[in-house]
Amino acid sequence: MEAVKTFNSELYSLNDYKPPISKAKMTQITKAAIKAIKFYKHVVQSVEKFIQKCKPEYKVPGLYVIDSIVRQSRHQFGQEKDVFAPRFSNNIISTFQNLYRCPGDDKSKIVRVLNLWQKNNVFKSEIIQPLLDMAAGIPPPVVTPVLASTTAAMSNTPGTPVTPVTPANVVQGLPDPWVSQIANTDTLAAVAQILQSPQGQQLQQLIQTLQIQQQKPQPSILQALDAGLVVQLQALTAQLTAAAAAANTLTPLDQGVSFNKKLMDRFDFGEDSEHSEESKKEMPTPQLSHVSESVNNSIFHQIAEQLQQQNLEQLRQQLLEQQQPQKVTPQDSQEGTFGSEHSASPSQGSSQQHFLEPEANLDDSIDIQQQDMDIDEGQDVVEEEIFEPEAKKVAVRSRSRTHSRSRSRSPRKRRSRSRSGSRKRKHRKRSRSHSREKKRKASRSYSSERRAREREKERQKKGLPPVRSKTLSVCSTTLWVGQVDKKATQQDLTNLFEEFGQIESINMIPPRGCAYVCMVHRQDSFRALQKLSSGSYKIGSKVIKIAWALNKGVKTEYKQFWDVDLGVTYIPWEKVKVDDLDGFAEGGMIDQETVNAEWETVKASEPVKEPVQTAQSPAPVEKESVVTTQAEVFPPPVAMLQIPVAPAVPAVSLVPPAFPVSMPVPPPGFNPIPPPPFLRASFNPSQPPPGFMPPPVPPPVVPPPAIPPVVPTSLVQPPLSMTPEAVKDVGFGSLVLPSGSVAGSLAPSTLPAGNVFNPPSKAEPEEKVPHLIEHQIPSGENTRPVIPSDIPSSAAMLAQPPGASSTSGILCVQRPNVSSNSEILGVRPANVSNSAAIMGAQPPNILNNSGILAIQPPNVSSGSGLLGVLPPNLPNNSGLVGLQPPNVTSPAGLLGTQPPIGPQNLPPLAIPAQRMPALPMLDIRPGLIAQAPGPRFPLLQPGIPPQRGIPPPSVLDAALHPPPRGPFPPGDLFSQPERPFLAPGRPSIDNVPNPDKRIPLGNDNIQQEGDRDYRFPPIETREGITRPPQVDVRDVVGRRLDPREGPGRPPLDARDHFGRPPVDMRENLVRPSLDHLGRRDHFGFPPEKPWGPRDFDEREHRVLPVFGGPKGLHEERGRFRAGNYRFDPRSGPWNRGFGQEVHRDFDDRRRPWERQRDRDDRDFDFCREINGNRLGRDRIQNTWVPPPHARVFDYFEGATSQRKGDNVPQVNGENTERHAQPPPLPVQKDPELYEKLASSGDVDKEESGTVAGVESEAVVESTETEGT
């Protein structure tokens, strides 16, 4: 019974899904049912109960469950052994009575399943036939009082006798207008005769159905006319004539069977129906004379006419209003039918005409309506196909039939016309003129219909979904991509999708293995969906899934209207808020055909919010010019690169006072009349690509975001003199390079001072700038933005075409949003490529990572953008322009230089390939550029190494500053995040847990450390201290390169890493590391030879972390250790006290041991001997845990914190009493470490072990024994 419980839970979980149910879910339910086949009776009962109790919209999924289970069982066990089908057929009538309580639209799906069952012999014909009759409205064999719904008389059991239909009952059931017509008893008798036939009963039910539908409010034609009803009506009208004609020739049984067969064919919407119609219509007419003319004419035609004229007329009227073809109504078409020249008897002719004309018209109207229905039912067929894997071919056939029907409608109708024409050959005299007239009218309707069809095809090509009346279609252009490999990159997705069209954005969610790809055009995303869903496309190793995704612009309240299959949100007009319209287009587009015209008038009538005017009001002319360009206004472009920006500054505070109409570009803050609604907000054809000058017609400008996008730049900004008087509050919109503050020698003669921009008047409100700045600048700091000195407002901007080469230095001030990735005003050089950043003034509230050169107000903290100066020709790949300032502790890499106060009258630099001519030579030498008293940092070149000769400022005494030697940098220019080989950054030297243990700096260190190696000269006598080191890697001949050195070696000529790159905290461990001079001896350097200009410094060049304590400039040495400081007093190999006190790293097995091992042959051989002999092993438990492999550890000593640094005797750096006084063992405290060291058989594993592994186990901080 466990299997039954599983099946029940699967089945009832259908209620958690919104129909239509997915194929995967159906498969799960079917599998559960097949697993529970031993309890098949329980399974069948569960499904029947589910269908009985579920909500109407879940009835059809319940039928699909039956279908799927029966098909799977027949497929798996064979038709004879299948137990499910017979069991379901036991109770199938009541099951289908419950099924027919589904919504009206779903009935056609039930009929379709029944037809498929019949074709595939899933159930016997005698079982399916009554079910089809039920669909047509024929009750199962018992007639009980009619219910007020389409599912009348469904609760009967088969086998009970039929109660006769009396004329009185019929009269009661008929609507009032008919009762008056059926007054006399002859008529009543005739009616009774007709209505007692099965067709009569069907007709009765149809009448009631139509009545009910008339009473219901009819929101749209599609809901009013459900497919089943129209088909039934068409079938019955034709059938009743034929039945009345053949009443004497056919037995009732034959009649029923033939009728049902034909009816069933109708439901199939196939071409077969035409053949049945053909045969039916060509039945010999003489037979009609056997039937009483009174019945034929007076009663039946009155009923038929009533039906068609009352119901179909109003329905078709509705339909025609929608489609607006000029179509002829039934009355028109019947006007000409009663001519004097009818060759048949008048009654016969009129009856026949009555039938032929309405039927032809009915056929037209049904076809028009079918066109609409096919659009919806196409999806139903697909859905059905999902649930019937067995009958795929059949389903495909039926689908192609429905679609071919919708495609080839006009030829089919011509066929039906020609058929009726062939019948009229007998009556050619009377019908010639009429048929001509009809053809004219018909051709008119065909042409309009063809137009509608072509329009629909066009829409499908564009990927647009079908239009629904009084409904706004918001079409998504966003695709959901599922099962994306977690290793996949954004580039992989871009490569896959860009062949279909322009991509607006890609949002990846690696943990969920999916991504959202937003395309610019609906057509592109539609094609991508079609193609990628059909094949098995892989990204990485996984086959992706793809589907429509709800676009961002549709808010939560509208999500209920989302249709995932069509990728469209159908929002009823009455639910749409006009304010939300603009937002809908984000990640999608609005189908213009579905927009309510009233909304546009509502939007147009809303007053345009005028910009807040400053003291100077704009000229009226300007206003008009903006209005005239309204027609050309396009919506502002969405930033194509999707760069996150800070919240946009309100437009109110950005408006400059006025700008002359002749200006080619509107000023930065100007906010014109908003664009007309419903235009797609993505690609703006009126704007040039990024990097070009804007067109002369001012396109619309959105308020620029507070932060520009990050673009690497390599332009030079001249130092500006900013006097405190010039520093005033200004609006963001006009913060530009103030020409008055550029030194006269820097501005070329072609650009007179004053023509850069038109500053705002002083009447601008003063709250603006603090309002902008307060987000980013810490509150305790003095923020003084820069203002340009007053410039005559008549000045015009220089505009120059993008390709022109210019020697004038400053080209023009660029509008903030010329394109989506240049949002900052600035100066453009002549030959800057599109991706270059804009250089120039920047508002003070820029974030750290913006990477744009900016003017830094004197007292603003380093947290906001600072002015960085970059040499002319060097590209800067890091995206941050600026040098890491010596004492800025954040790792963010701020732009760390500031302009000096006075103007620098330096000679212009004359480099041929210079990007920006006529800018001053920025020769960076200490003391060359006067330092302002305010700035804390020297003005250094960022991005490339500064001169190699200069050690970091303030690291050496002032007396030791040498003259500059060459063009290479002093120190480590690369901020901590950019470590080579991804080694984690070391904390800096201030972080020693116990500040008392910190070693004094400078010369004091020499006195304190008694165990220095006196082979080195004292620090005062050093020479060549700043000579650039030689980048030259040599190794001991004959010693195999240790595999651990592989990843650590620097590139041979990379001057950015002068020594080996750091390997997490592996610098000075327990044992002192190899002395550099000793190492040189090994390499064949004679000791008397001075350190050469290209000698390779083997030492680490990053300072070791010391925890805690504030940092001074001297201690922030990690940044500047790249230089060759051979005699560095602190982290040199001989400073045993320093090394011992700082480090607690027991598990480090890299550099220090290599250096120690290589230091000299005697020491190397001695270590090997110790590791290899019995004596060494005997002492394991006292002193250290040696690995068996000499390469991994030569030896291992106790914690540095437990040794005294100063009184350990030393011979040549060797600790001779190493074995005599064993330090306390750390390893018993840390069993994990003990195992790790002891199991050094895993040497090879550990050599290649990751840095992360070492980190996680290595550091053991024994703070409790620190004082001993």
Swiss-Prot record:
Keyword Phosphoprotein: yes
Database matches in PROSITE patterns: CID (PS51391), RRM (PS50102)
Family matches, as CDD domains: CID_SCAF8, RRM_SCAF8
Domain CID: residue ranges: 1-139
Residues modified as Asymmetric dimethylarginine: R915, R925, R936, R1071
GO terms for MF: RNA binding; RNA polymerase II C-terminal domain phosphoserine binding
Biased composition (Basic and acidic residues): 270-283, 447-461
Bias (Low complexity) ranges: 1249-1262
Protein name as annotated: SR-related and CTD-associated factor 8
Top-level taxonomy: Eukaryota, Metazoa, Chordata, Craniata, Vertebrata
